[in-house]
């Protein structure tokens, strides 16, 4: 039979191999003709490289968080794909991973420097920061760039950073300038070592310095090396630039909508001016007083983050259960007598009753905040009401709307609260004169204390349990499913909890008063 003919059999085998190769070649040809954006959409995943630090990305009590992480979530949502975060502990691995195609985007709070824009596309800037030289408080302070060449201490910077690049330029003016470049580290670590006195000086971005001072108050500013510089995401320079074009569109949209301003407010709008004495006192209180009351804060926080209730209590009484003011408010939460009665507190000096009552009163204030305000912002409006009164807070919202601002965002309303002291504004309001500036300081202090507790916990614990650690080809990833269009909860807040709760993790070893 023909089927047993060796020549026919051989021909069939060759034909089958040729057909398979042709099909594979066709698939490859088709893949090569896809744009970068089409390839990402076809794969169903956008891979975002970032740095594991307090601003860009970290794993908190409620899962992944950070400014760059939240921006990446929104970008993945725009694409309709899963988000795969690839956080690294040092800068050295980010751009090489981008170049070899291991990630699609670098999103790590990095400066647009000359060498970076020569090799990569920079998306539109999403915030600005200057370069700051820092030293330990109480030690010798360099006051101008020339002082760094006096050999009165060692200047240490992250290898390959924009800070190192700036020093290379400065060396042309100051030939005696020297420094050490450290590869396996990041700015957060260098700032910590300066605070401990293990390093003399380092350079960090102004935003990182401000955040670090909340948990390392001995970090002191020596001088500003540069003016504000743009911070951006980066992508490879490809032939079609489709991904780059979409990033330009994306950042334009979130700037126009106000989403970017709200995220910036969330992550560093609370920083404000730095008070060395207050910060030192607060950190001492975290160590000496907070452990005694932590269980009660957790017990009565319910839907709140217990650290927020703790921050509120510190603002009110400095965690002193016997605190009494000349106006008659008293206890851990400094409740007035009418407020205490309204929440069932019989003894305001009983710390458990006071904490329970304070949390319940805040809950009541939040329930009165209009549902048009997103849930994560309601608490700031409620705290302002807690301090200055609900009517005055609503006056500030109405004034914000009248001046063309967004009365539903804390970013805009907090700018109008101090105006309630001025006659030309309060005489047109429903509730008249108010010490709105004090209410603003009250809320911002609580936000700072809250973030400091979080930062303190980060600095003194590990983000990951050993059971969660899995090494896959030396690469860590956090993969999230496609983020659905953000829908309003019944209280008007936006709900992305499903995306976070179903996160799949793998880890890399990279080298009140009134």
Curated annotation (Swiss-Prot):
Q: What class of enzyme is it?
A: lyase
Q: Which Pfam families match?
A: SBP_bac_3, SLT
Q: Which SMART domains match?
A: PBPb
A single GO CC term for this protein reads: cell outer membrane
Keywords on record: Cell outer membrane, Cell wall biogenesis/degradation, Lyase, Membrane, Signal
Family recorded in the similarity comment: In the N-terminal section; belongs to the bacterial solute-binding protein 3 family. In the C-terminal section; belongs to the transglycosylase Slt family.
Protein name, entry field: Membrane-bound lytic murein transglycosylase F
Lineage here is: Bacteria, Pseudomonadati, Pseudomonadota, Gammaproteobacteria, Vibrionales
């Amino acid at each position: 039979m023909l089927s047993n003919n060796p020549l026919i059999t051989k021909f069939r085998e060759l034909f089958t191999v040729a057909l398979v190769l042709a099909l594979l070649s066709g698939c490859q040809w088709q893949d090569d003709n896809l744009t970068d954006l089409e390839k990402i959409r076809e794969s169903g995943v956008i891979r975002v490289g970032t740095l594991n630090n307090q601003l860009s990305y970290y794993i908190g009590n409620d899962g992944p968080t950070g400014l760059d992480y939240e921006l990446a979530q929104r970008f993945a949502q725009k694409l309709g794909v899963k988000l795969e975060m690839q956080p690294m502990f040092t800068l050295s691995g980010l751009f090489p991973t981008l170049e070899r195609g291991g990630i699609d985007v670098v999103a790590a709070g990095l400066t647009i420097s000359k060498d970076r824009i020569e090799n990569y596309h920079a998306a539109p800037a999403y915030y600005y920061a200057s370069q700051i030289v820092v030293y330990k408080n109480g030690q010798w302070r360099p006051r101008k760039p020339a002082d760094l060449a006096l050999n009165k201490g060692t200047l240490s910077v992250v290898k390959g950073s924009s800070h190192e690049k700036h020093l290379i330029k400065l060396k042309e003016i100051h030939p005696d300038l020297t420094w050490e470049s450290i590869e396996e580290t990041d700015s957060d670590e260098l700032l910590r070592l300066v605070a401990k006195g293990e390093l003399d000086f380092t350079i960090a971005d102004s935003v990182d310095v401000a955040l670090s001072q909340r948990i390392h108050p001995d970090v002191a500013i020596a001088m500003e090396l540069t003016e504000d510089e743009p911070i951006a995401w980066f992508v490879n320079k490809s032939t079609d630039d489709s991904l780059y074009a979409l990033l330009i569109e994306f950042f334009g949209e979130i700037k126009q909508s106000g989403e970017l301003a709200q995220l910036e407010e969330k992550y560093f709008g609370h920083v404000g001016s730095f008070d060395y004495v207050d910060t030192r006192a607060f950190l001492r209180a975290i160590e000496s007083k907070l452990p005694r009351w932590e269980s009660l804060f957790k017990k009565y926080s319910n839907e709140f983050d217990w650290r927020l209730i703790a921050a509120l209590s510190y603002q009110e009484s400095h965690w002193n259960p016997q605190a009494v003011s000349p106006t008659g408010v008293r206890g851990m939460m400094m409740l007035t007598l009418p407020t205490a009665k309204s929440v069932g507190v019989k003894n305001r000096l009983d710390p458990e009753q006071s904490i329970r009552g304070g949390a319940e009163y805040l809950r009541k204030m939040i329930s009165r905040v209009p549902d048009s305000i997103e849930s994560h912002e309601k608490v700031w409006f409620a705290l302002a009401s807690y301090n200055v009164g609900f009517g005055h807070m609503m006056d500030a919202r109405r004034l914000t709307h009248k001046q063309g601002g967004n009365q539903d965002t804390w970013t805009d309303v907090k700018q109008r609260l101090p105006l309630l002291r001025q006659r030309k504004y309060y005489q047109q309001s429903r509730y008249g004169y108010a010490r709105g500036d004090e209410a603003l300081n009250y809320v911002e202090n609580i936000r700072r204390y809250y973030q400091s507790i979080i930062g303190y916990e980060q600095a003194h614990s590990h983000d990951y349990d050993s059971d969660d650690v899995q090494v896959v080809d030396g690469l860590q990833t956090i993969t999230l499913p496609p983020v659905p269009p953000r829908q309003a909860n019944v209280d008007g807040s936006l709900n992305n909890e499903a995306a976070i709760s179903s996160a799949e993790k793998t880890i890399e070893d990279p080298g009140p008063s009134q």
